[in-house]
A protein has these predicted regions:
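Eukaryote-biased RCC1-like beta-propeller repeat architecture
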Residues: 1-177
Length: 177
């Protein structure tokens, strides 16, 4: 059954993807990412502390790729409400999203500038952050870990894809002489 989500009235959503029990939405500017659903591995990308098992967010919330952790809300009485404050999002700092890919419990985002971000389930290297680390609760920029035998190279992500507990990315390089 299709259901209209009133939250999106007046917002022009142009990109969507869905993970195991959560959804991602990007507006036509490419700078506003919204997420809702289950988020106990940090896959909703908007909490400061690891949510309880089964944490579920019914209404979509904005997830900035670039944020100031100092401008966040600390709620000691209810840590589940600790989140990035939307008023502190600097729109000019937000990169334009080219692609969003939802794995089972983690997210990958590709920007038009060739950068990539990931967050969510971090075990077994699922987020591609270079090691088997804890869950990544907020968007974190991916840094390619590649070496060249000669010269200095710059890398650009071309495509990202999240799977069950793994990620794949297509990266191009340009050697600078």
């Amino acid at each position: 059954m299709l259901l209209q989500v009133e939250f999106f009235d007046g917002k022009d959503i142009t990109k969507v993807d869905a993970g195991l029990q959560y959804s991602c939405f990007v507006d036509k500017t490419g700078k506003a990412l919204y997420m809702c659903g289950r988020g106990d591995y940090g896959q909703l990308g908007n909490t400061l502390e690891k949510p309880d098992e089964g944490h579920f967010q019914t209404l979509p919330s904005r997830v900035p790729l670039v944020y100031d952790i100092q401008g966040t809300r600390q709620n000691v009485a209810n840590p589940k409400e600790n989140s990035i404050i939307l008023d502190n999002i600097v729109e000019e700092d937000q990169p334009e999203i080219e692609q969003v890919s939802a794995g089972d419990t983690h997210v990958l985002v590709l920007t038009k500038g060739g950068a990539a971000y990931s967050w969510g389930f971090g075990a077994m290297g699922a987020c591609g952050q270079g090691k088997d680390e804890d869950d990544v609760l907020r968007p974190k920029k991916l840094e390619p870990k590649m070496t060249k035998s000669q010269g200095t190279s710059t890398y650009k992500f071309q495509y990202v894809s999240g799977g069950g507990q793994h990620s794949t990315a297509l990266v191009t390089s340009q050697t600078l002489s």
